[in-house]
Amino acid sequence: MRVKHLDISNHKIWKDKNIKPEAKEIYAYLFAEGFERTISHISIGRIQRELKSITNIGFRNNLKILEKNKYLVYKEYDTGLYKYHIY
């Protein structure tokens, strides 16, 4: 059995100029949380523990940018609760 290791240091998102640094940080957190999962769920409260200054609207706007640039797909199924899939 082969074990997968989490390595996001060489990911193409770091060189993408269309993505804001805050969105890159969110992507890295979501990537680590959803590692080896098809679909993951997250609440804005868990994100706010890591990124103190982010609001639900700011988080949603960053997810829209990431979705537009084909890094993930998300859906807000309740206020502050999201499910997402990383490509």
What are these regions (language model features)?
Residues 25-29:
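Pre-recognition alpha-helix immediately N-terminal to the DNA-recognition helix
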